[in-house]
Amino acid sequence: MADTIHWADVIAEDVLKKNGKHLVATGITPSGNIHIGNMREVVTADAVYRALVDKGANADFIYIADNYDPLRKVYPFLPESYVEHVGKPISEIPCPCGNCANYAEHFLKPFLEALRRLGINPKVYRADEMYKTGKYTEAIKTALVKRDAIAKILEEVSGKTVASDWSPFNPRCDQCGRITTTKVTGFDLEAETVDYVCACEHSGTVPMAGGGKLTWRVDWPARWSVLGVTVEPFGKDHASRGGSYDTGKRIVKEIFGHEPPYPIVYEWIMLGKQGAMSSSTGVVVSISDMLKIVPPEVLRYLIIRTKPEKHIQFDPGQPLLSLVDEYERLRTQFRENDPSLGTFQGRVYELSRATGVCQSEIPFKQMVTIYQVARGDFDQVLKIVKRSGFSTEDKKCIKELADNVSKWLKLYAPPFAKFKVKEKVPVQAATLSELQRAFLSAFAALIESRDEISGEEYHMLVYSAKDEGSELNRRIAEKLNAHAPQVDPRELFKAIYISLLGQSSGPKAGWFLSSFEKEFLVERFEEASNYSPEINV
């Protein structure tokens, strides 16, 4: 049986079985380009937050940038010079481009801007600031004192032996700056300091506030306790048996005295045939790059339409057109109060909407046609948009969509989606049959006799040629000196594309033809109907 209640509402109803204020949290380490695989976590959290608010809940939504995590290795996109920074917190090492405050901000800034464009507005926390301002200090004290109890939980749940010199806190070496090569040798609860020795042979004392960080399996449950997190989505890797959620839910209860958050486990987004996206392997399409190609609400729709536990296949090539078409049909149904639109699909649309951002009425596919007919000239784009029956009042939104299409054509569009209008009748017109030539001449005369013609009307006019007694059929018959010719519309569409593009196929004919000035079509079709290689040399 088809779903009638959206998954975000189902989760919200479950969450609200517990009274009180709710905090939806999401967190990502900005160690590389934050990609649309990561976006699933944030959009999922936003959908549940919206659902909670819609149900009248007292709820907040936060995003934690785990920028105090160490650089794990020299990733493929980094120069070898970064080897000296491996093991240091990414908030404390240089920006790759030199224009940001640090490495983490280089990747975080475009991601936060992408969230804004997606209509997602969580309160943003940076982990380095939380540690340095002392938000974690009490949790660090508790973890250090209860080190043995935490180690026991880790061993019982994960099945792995914890080393005798393991500590829940990783001090940051004053000498080399790393947090992955230090060992705790002692701590002072009153002074709130930790003693350590580092593999670089330096030893020292650091403050608990900012002098290091909790290990991941302790940091996560400590965060739930410190911030009061009640709901959090996370990838299936954290949800594996004996994984960080399994250990975290015991640590947060038994060590920090707080209930674990409601878990929302999500599957990966697979990039075409390349597999699951990963910043560290370079199999990515960053959110900011994808927003240069796809309208924000379509990216939201990609996530919202699918339950979190199901994987998503994403291909920015030809399949992207189908995705956009699907969303645009849903939008039309919703706006026209289509009775065939079910409750579930209606809710999908509501949660896909990116509030406060451009939402052009022009279909993406139609802009693909318009942009290429206009040869990328935005003034011409505006003229065609107006001629196609759309408002040109919001030029900013039209420009944004045109830019999306421009990037898509350049980077991902399959060959069949691209075309170039020939400046003169192409030589391929020599291959036109007698029937095709008669059609083009008759079609030109019929167009000339009409006022403005819409894309749908162009489409229907061409198809009318097959109907005996139609005006176009009669005109073709006159050109051929024949009675009611047998016409295959496919041959007529082929004639249109040959005369304009020099190829036998092209974009949807109605949209395509309505993009041109009527006078241009009349002249071109008449010329093509009389084309001869000898005459047109």
UniProtKB/Swiss-Prot annotation:
InterPro entries: aa-tRNA-synth_I_codon-bd_sub2, aa-tRNA-synth_I_CS, aa_tRNA-synth_I_cd-bd_sf, Lys-tRNA-ligase, Lys-tRNA-ligase_SC_fold, Rossmann-like_a/b/a_fold
Family annotation (Gene3D superfamilies): 1.10.10.350, 1.10.10.770, HUPs, Lysine tRNA ligase, stem contact fold domain
GO molecular function: ATP binding; lysine-tRNA ligase activity; tRNA binding
Gene Ontology biological-process entries: lysyl-tRNA aminoacylation
UniProt subcellular location: Cytoplasm
GO CC terms of this entry: cytoplasm
Enzyme Commission number: 6.1.1.6
KW Magnesium (keyword) present: no
Main location: cytoplasm
Enzyme class: ligase
PROSITE patterns: AA_TRNA_LIGASE_I (PS00178)
Superkingdom of source: Archaea
Motif ('KMSKS' region): 276-280
Record keywords: Aminoacyl-tRNA synthetase, ATP-binding, Cytoplasm, Ligase, Nucleotide-binding, Protein biosynthesis
Intervals of motif 'HIGH' region: 30-38
Reactions catalysed: tRNA(Lys) + L-lysine + ATP = L-lysyl-tRNA(Lys) + AMP + diphosphate
Family: Belongs to the class-I aminoacyl-tRNA synthetase family.
HAMAP family the record matches: Lys_tRNA_synth_class1
Name of protein: Lysine--tRNA ligase
Organism of provenance: Methanosarcina barkeri
Gene: lysS
